[in-house]
Design a protein with these regions (language model features):
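ATPase nucleotide-binding head domains, primarily ABC-like/P-loop NTPase cores
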Residues: 259, 547, 551-580, 584, ...
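Short, flexible, mixed-charge glycine/proline-rich loop motifs
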Residues: 916-925, 959-964
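Short cysteine-rich clusters marking metal-coordination/redox-active sites
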Residues: 929-932, 970
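Short Cys/His-centered divalent metal-binding micro-motifs
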Residues: 965-985
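Basic, polar low-complexity surface loops/patches
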Residues: 1-340, 352-360, 373, 380-386, ...
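A conserved P-loop NTPase coupling/switch region
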Residues: 31-32, 36-59, 149-151, 171, ...
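Short Cys/His-rich Zn2+-coordinating modules
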Residues: 907-920, 948-956
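Histidine-centered nuclease catalytic patch
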Residues: 932-966, 983
Length: 985
């Protein structure tokens, strides 16, 4: 019972430290076991353990239940626990001291690393949030344990608790998809913590979330570590420990003094990972400080609203066309796919960086497909590098590395004379060589291959996993003592074989048949090595020795003298006897001992080699950068040619301003044109803010562009399913691709880079549990109004669709006026035709209206969609056209149309027979206002004033009420004419 009491004590401590989703695994002999009580809270835990690991629960001790598995299956069950979101605390037995156990590892979803995992990354993140008097500050830190890369970010936002408050946090989570998240909050209620997990998608990607209240010591066992993470003395010590003594001089780390909460988050996270597995933070890279990057801000959940990545409902198993990332990711290596995702999700604002990508893509456009078969052979070199740093790389991995080095060397030799590629590699290398005589990639590959091949037999390494005793794979000449042992071992085996052959010959003297190998060399893990034969044959052997009067014989090339008189034949199994003697026992023992010594030395040589290989990390980083860059280049060239994308043109800023704009010709939606292969995709031309001076340039060169009088905003009208939202998304996707350095799905695109994209596309409210569509819309609109500039792109779909019409129209028009005043680029899909006649809308001179039409073809009984943008708002009765296609009753449709004509129809749709004649002249009808053409006429105005008429009602020679002297006007125009005497529109 003392063992079980110790188990429960350690388990209680583990749960208090690592959270309620924690299991303790204790090694007992050859098994790892988990215990619980037959009743009480511990019973539920053991039942959950058995369910997760698919194990049976045993009741061998009264009041105690247990479950377990063999020690060699530890990694298998650790993986099951990680997938289910549990932390496993493992206590293993000491190999030398009986009944002595110690903590051997803590494994959680974000700190578990295995070479067999097919995932591109495994991240653990720490989010530190604090609500202050007037703002909310969020510090974020992330570590990818597969690659050793880390990143940090800090944002200050409004105090309001709403989805848009956590926009940057949502982007951070979407970009890194951590499997484990630590949430440290201050001044947050439990409900608010639950909300922000839903708002940001933490609940969708993280298998384990630790919620720690920085202000409540009674509910937080880690409060001491949280408080220490705030103190600079601990921060400096941790940075120096994990990033080296020169960390304080690093540009990125020096920035931490300006970003307090990001520093605290990274400090706590580094300590958290170190306590789980110290090897995981060994030689991790200095963090990328995202606040200092030139990335474009993708606000209001743009990544998901534009389908750049799968939304929460897009299953991870979604097809190639479930997101832009999946469609465009044609990388052949895990490293390439990992870095391509980072690039696509963090588009740049730097024109120079974009131009560099366009130039190299143009240079390599038709050559990189030849690289794809070679790149497909490469394994995850970043993960290999981390496993080497962690000393967890098996010989099989070195065999794969050996082959990969040959592929990389071949690739490098193929492009070594290509000056533009060489310049690009140097410009994009985060750690360029520090000396002029630094080794080239091909030289590094050749040297490492030589080192591997001269140390190990690479063919044998291919079959050696984590058990280094499977075979001897170290080459001769590496260790003299190993070579001596091998010779001794081989001699002993040869002698044993010669003894067996001699005994075989003696037995066969008494046999009628001449079967070979009647004496077997039998080997077991527990029993060791021995000679065995059947009982009948061992009797024959004894008879032959006696008959021939044999006592001692010299056997083998080394003339081993074997004493036959001391042979005995104890029972081995039911059918066999063992053939043994003191001399044979010593020979067999020497074979076992020498074999074990060989295994020990092989393991020692291998461990020393891996330690030596760890010193080559700069060279590994050089190879990783080269292989990753080659894969990224082939990917961007491959998708450009495969999908017929074009090179974007970046417009330069000139004296007319620096406002962002775009001019897209032949714009396509890259996903829809792949999904709908039955019809040809209808491309559109869309240009906003491009100016009269826009030019497509030559060869993608930067060209000057004036602002001109081109519209900077657009309203798109049309029924649902006609393609409004798809067109809006296509614009956002094209801009993101262009600023990520990719070719775009257009026939041409000229643009000036944006710093921010805001989106508001319907269907987003499912992200925010408990909030209505209208609340979400207004939260996102608030952010747009507060942050939009003339370098922002706003993409909206049916804004204000979640409230009643009067409020919707008012809010929408006010929003358009604000965006027009700011000078940003904006597009909205809308059904609000009534705003076309508003004075406030008429004043928006840099906003245009377009429409996509749909009509019902009665003869074909089908809706005909014209997906080409047309000028103006178009007809306002497309809903009735859809109703016709659905065969609603004719009487119903006629009544609906009558209601529309009476209350909602624009003047142009009202029949002439509905117009009333003027009381001045029955031949003059009060139809549509002849001045503005947008309202029905309420007044009839005399062009030559009535006051000038004589007693005969003539004005000069013109009758006062002549049709030519009468003008039908709406009330507003009538008032304006009397005030200004201006009859023009």
């Amino acid at each position: 019972m003392s063992l079980i009491k110790e188990y429960f004590r350690l388990s209680t401590e583990a749960v208090a430290k690592y959270g309620p989703k924690t299991f303790l695994l204790m090694q007992v002999g050859a098994f790892y076991e988990c215990y619980g009580e037959t009743s009480g809270p511990n019973r539920a835990a053991i039942d959950e353990f058995c369910r997760t690991c698919e194990l049976a629960c045993a009741n061998k001790t009264p009041g105690i239940v247990m479950a377990g598995f063999r020690d060699y299956s530890l990694e298998k069950y650790l993986n099951k626990l990680q997938e289910a979101g549990y932390t496993a605390v493992v206590h293993s037995q000491d190999a030398q001291i009986k009944d002595e156990r110690a903590l051997s590892g803590v494994y959680s979803p974000g700190t578990f690393m295995t070479g067999e995992s097919a995932a591109l990354s495994n991240c653990v993140a720490c989010i530190w949030l604090e609500r202050m008097r007037s703002k909310t500050v969020i510090g974020m830190a992330n570590i990818d344990v597969f690659t050793g890369r880390s990143s940090v970010f800090e944002v200050e936002t409004e105090l309001m608790h709403a989805p848009t408050t956590y926009d940057e946090l949502e982007r951070f989570i979407s970009a890194h998809s951590p499997s484990e998240v630590i949430l440290i909050t201050d001044n947050f209620s439990q409900r608010m913590v639950e909300d922000l997990q839903n708002y940001t998608g933490i609940t969708d990607c993280a298998r384990l979330v630790h919620v720690l209240d920085a202000a409540n010591a009674t509910t937080n066992a880690n409060i001491n570590q949280i408080q220490k993470s705030k103190r600079q003395v601990y921060q400096r010590e941790i940075m120096a420990r994990f990033f080296g003594a020169s960390a304080s001089a690093s540009h990125s780390l020096a920035s931490f003094t300006s970003y307090e909460f990001a520093t605290q988050a990274l400090t706590y996270l580094l300590n958290f990972v170190h306590e789980h597995n110290p090897h995981l933070v060994h030689r991790i890279t200095e963090p990328v400080f995202e606040n200092q990057s030139d990335r474009m801000v993708l606000a209001n959940h743009s990544l998901k609203q534009l389908n750049i990545i799968d939304d929460d409902n897009g299953a991870k198993s979604g097809g190639k066309c479930s997101s832009v990332y999946k469609l465009l990711n044609n990388c052949m290596t895990p490293m390439g796919a990992r870095h391509f995702r980072t690039r696509l999700l963090n588009p740049s604002c730097s024109a120079a960086k974009m131009q560099r990508e366009y130039d190299i893509t143009d240079h390599l456009l038709l050559t990189t497909d030849a690289w794809r078969p070679q790149l497909a052979q490469l394994k995850d070199l970043e993960k290999f590098n981390r496993l080497i740093m962690l000393r967890k790389c098996p010989p099989q991995m070195l065999h794969a590395l050996y082959g990969n080095l040959a592929v990389i060397e071949e690739l490098h030799l193929a492009i070594v004379e290509d000056a533009p590629v060489g310049a690009y590699l140097h410009a994009t290398n985060p750690l360029p060589p520090t000396t002029a005589n630094a080794e080239s990639v091909s030289d590094v590959c050749a040297r490492l291959r030589h080192l591997l091949n001269t140390t190990f037999d690479m063919d044998r390494c291919a079959n050696v996993g984590s058990d280094l005793g499977e075979c001897d794979f170290v080459r001769s000449g590496i260790r003299a003592d190993l070579d001596t042992l091998r010779a001794k071992h081989a001699g002993a085996i040869k002698t044993l074989g010669a003894v067996r052959d001699f005994l075989d010959s003696l037995i066969l003297c008494g046999e009628k048949t001449k079967a070979a190998d009647v004496v077997k060399i039998h080997e077991t893990e527990k029993g060791g090595i021995s000679l065995q034969a059947t009982k009948r044959r061992t009797k024959l052997l004894a008879d032959q020795i006696k008959r021939q009067g044999l006592d001692k014989v010299c056997i083998g090339a080394d003339n081993c003298c074997l004493s036959l008189s001391t042979l005995t034949y104890p029972t081995a199994t039911g059918a066999n006897n063992e053939i043994t003697s003191p001399q044979l026992s010593e020979l067999c023992r020497s074979i076992i001992v020498s074999n074990q010594k060989i295994k020990d030395i092989v393991a020692q040589v291998y461990a020393e080699f891996v330690d030596k290989l760890r010193d080559s990390e700069p060279e590994f980083q050089q190879l990783i950068h080269f292989a990753t860059t080659m894969d990224l280049l082939q990917n961007q060239c491959h998708i450009a040619t495969k999908y017929k994308f074009c090179r974007p043109t970046i417009a330069s800023a000139n004296e007319n301003g620096t406002k962002s704009f775009f001019d897209a010709r032949g714009l396509r939606h890259c996903l829809i044109e792949r999904l709908n292969e039955d019809e040809t995709y209808v491309a559109n031309d869309v240009a906003l803010g491009s100016g009269e001076g826009t030019s497509s340039g030559s060869g993608g060169a930067v060209v000057p562009v004036g602002e001109g009088e081109q519209p900077r905003g657009m309203l798109i009208y049309g029924t649902n399913a006609v393609g409004k939202t798809s067109l809006i998304r296509a614009i956002g996707i094209a801009i993101i691709m262009a600023q990520a350095g990719l070719y775009v799905p257009c026939s041409s695109l000229t643009f000036r880079p944006y710093t921010t994209i805001f989106t508001r596309i319907l269907g987003n409210d499912n992200l925010f549990k408990g909030l209505s569509t209208f609340q979400v819309e207004m939260s996102e609109l608030r952010i747009i109004l507060r942050m939009a500039t003339d370098r922002s792109l706003i993409l909206g779909d049916e804004l204000c669709s979640g409230t009643e019409m009067d409020s919707a129209v008012s809010i929408f028009v006010a929003g358009l006026a604000h965006l027009h005043r700011v000078g940003c680029t904006f597009l909205f899909a809308t059904h609000m035709h009534e705003i076309n006649g508003y004075d406030e809308v008429r004043l928006l001179t840099k906003m245009c209206m377009k429409h996509l039409t749909v009509v019902y073809d009665k003869a074909r009984d089908a809706l005909i969609y014209n997906r080409k943008l047309a000028d103006g708002p178009g007809a306002s009765m497309y809903g009735l056209e859809v109703c016709k296609s659905l065969h609603l009753p004719d009487a119903f449709l006629e009544f609906a149309n009558a209601v529309r004509l009476r209350h909602r129809a624009p003047p142009s749709d009202i029949g002439i027979l509905s117009f009333e004649p003027s009381h001045f002249n029955a031949r003059k009808l009060k139809g549509v206002c002849e001045r503005c053409s947008s309202e029905l006429a309420q007044e009839v105005h005399h062009l030559l004033p009535q006051k000038d008429a004589d007693h005969m009602n003539y004005i000069g020679h013109v009758p006062k009420n002549h049709v030519a002297n009468l003008m039908a006007l709406c009330t507003r125009c009538h008032d304006e004419v009397h005030g200004t005497h201006n009859f023009n529109k």
